[in-house]
Curated annotation (Swiss-Prot):
Residues 1-218 are annotated as: Pyrophosphorylase. In the N-terminal section; belongs to the N-acetylglucosamine-1-phosphate uridyltransferase family. In the C-terminal section; belongs to the transferase hexapeptide repeat family. The lineage of its organism: Bacteria, Thermotogati, Thermotogota, Thermotogae, Thermotogales. Its main location: cytoplasm. Its cofactor is Mg(2+). Residues 240-445 are annotated as: N-acetyltransferase. It comes from Thermotoga sp. (strain RQ2). This is Bifunctional protein GlmU. GO terms for biological process: cell morphogenesis; cell wall organization; lipid A biosynthetic process; peptidoglycan biosynthetic process; regulation of cell shape; UDP-N-acetylglucosamine biosynthetic process. HAMAP family: GlmU. The gene is glmU. Acetyl-CoA binds at A368, N374, Y375, S393, A411, R428.
């Protein structure tokens, strides 16, 4: 089985300089949805590109065969541009880059039906308002497809529509393509004409209108996003996740969340994030591509491409940037930013700190206002803080630097050299007290 994805259109009605198939749906480009599904049912996948072909090509896996349709002259013309992809002894599944939610199950049903001896198998659906769609007309055991623009008045009441998804026998398709003409209202080469040439046609019906919805406008894309969002929320609710306000909760379809986790309002969980069991997330929190363990609490914070182990507390108003690893039972408090750093088990950074390019051990206390000065103007340098160290408030650790196990850094210090284990590090000016100075100064004035 081969799958050919037609994705050459510009998408004029999207009013965008970005190719239509690259517009994201629930966090990933529409074409990525289709290619992933195609790869589950077909041994080889090809894609026909057109507008901004090189830009789209960069998003595709290396195992996808790419063909280019220089001029968009219809669906059959797009398939002709990939003629070398079609093998006489193999079947070909036709998909579309702007119809992202076609399901693996439906495609498998089509393939199974097709293998009963068909030249072509069509996916159809019944719509209350079929206007704009080609109709599937049955005449005994024969089927033909008439495009909406070419439909005679007496057939406009037919509600069975052609979704555009087909499985073709490779032998039949190679014979049919040269016979297709552009003698129609739009002057294009329709793949539906190949169906009309077929002697052995089989039909599979879908009742899920989401999976056959094509995206031609931003309005449709937003509608599809909302339908997919609510479908995901319903799935999570059925599997033991509490979502306090579905209307203000945005969770990408690829996200996984464990049972007994509570999601508060205004929470965004995106990408390939995985959240464990018995967590509390939000309110007003954004999580992107994170691995989160069990019993984790994240409040009013942003976490991006980070790993958070069990029993960790984050926030409020913390920011975890890419490469952050929070070990078990660590605590990150308000207005703390962490980047490319590992925070050890039981370590606390509760207030107003920046930790970048650092390796922090177990049970370390990071005092309020601690800064790792990692950038020297040319490169980022590492800071090492070993187990049990205590960093006093308002300290600056000028990297590269190492704070030894159990060492103590006095509040207000600027540390530029390594501090040995169990040592006191001080780096501040000596305090001067002048008794009565204020009164004396006032008399002079």
């Amino acid at each position: 089985m081969r799958a050919l994805v037609l994705a050459a259109g510009k998408g004029t009605r999207m009013k965008s300089k970005i190719p239509k198939v690259l517009h994201p749906l629930s966090g990933k480009p529409m074409i990525e949805w289709v290619v992933e599904t195609a790869g589950k049912v077909a041994q080889k996948v090809g894609v026909v590109l057109g507008f901004e072909a090189e830009l789209v090509r960069k998003t595709l896996p290396e195992w996808v065969d790419v063909f280019v349709q220089e001029e968009q002259l219809g669906t059959a013309h797009a398939v002709m541009c990939a003629k070398d992809f079609i093998e006489p002894g193999d079947d070909v599944l036709i998909l579309y880059g702007d119809v992202p939610l076609i399901s693996e199950n439906t495609l498998k049903r089509m393939i199974e039906e097709h293998r009963k001896g068909a030249d072509v198998t069509i996916l159809v659906a019944d719509l209350e308002d079929p206007s704009g769609y080609g109709r599937v007309i049955q005449d005994g055991d024969k089927y033909r497809i008439i495009e909406d623009a070419d439909l005679p008045e007496e057939l406009k009441s037919v509600t069975t529509i052609n979704t555009g998804f087909y499985v073709f026998s490779g032998d039949f398709l190679l014979r049919a393509l040269p016979e297709i003409k552009n003698e129609n209202a739009k002057g294009e080469y329709y793949l539906t004409d190949a169906v009309n040439f077929a002697e052995k046609v089989r039909v599979v019906k879908t009742d899920d209108l989401l999976e056959i919805t094509g995206v031609n406008t931003r309005k449709t894309l937003v509608w599809l996003e909302e339908q997919l969002r609510m479908r995901k929320i319903e799935e999570l609710l059925e599997n033991g996740v509490t979502i306090l306000d579905p209307a203000t909760t945005y969770i990408h379809y690829s996200v996984e969340i464990g049972m007994d986790t509570v999601i508060h309002p205004m929470t965004f969980i995106e990408g390939k994030s995985r959240v464990g069991e018995n967590c509390e997330i939000g309110p007003m929190t954004r999580i992107v591509d994170c691995e989160i363990g069990n019993n984790v609490k994240i409040t009013r914070s942003e976490c991006f491409k980070s790993v958070i182990e069990d029993d960790v507390s984050v926030g409020p108003f913390a920011r975890l940037r890419e490469g952050t690893i929070l070990k078990k039972s660590s605590k990150i408090g308000n207005f703390v930013e962490i980047k490319k750093s590992t925070i050890g088990e039981g370590t606390k950074a509760q207030h107003l700190s920046y930790i970048g390019d650092a390796f922090v051990g177990k049970n370390v206390n990071i005092g309020a206002g601690t800064i790792t000065c990692n950038y020297d103007g040319k490169k980022k340098n590492p800071t090492f803080i070993e187990d049990g160290a205590f960093i006093g408030s308002n300290s600056s650790l000028v990297a590269p630097v190492r704070i030894g196990e159990g060492a103590l850094i006095g509040a207000g210090s600027v540390i530029t050299e390594d501090v040995p284990p169990y040592s006191l590090g001080l780096g501040r000016a000596m305090q001067v007290v002048k008794e009565g100075w204020v009164l004396k100064k006032r008399k002079e004035e």
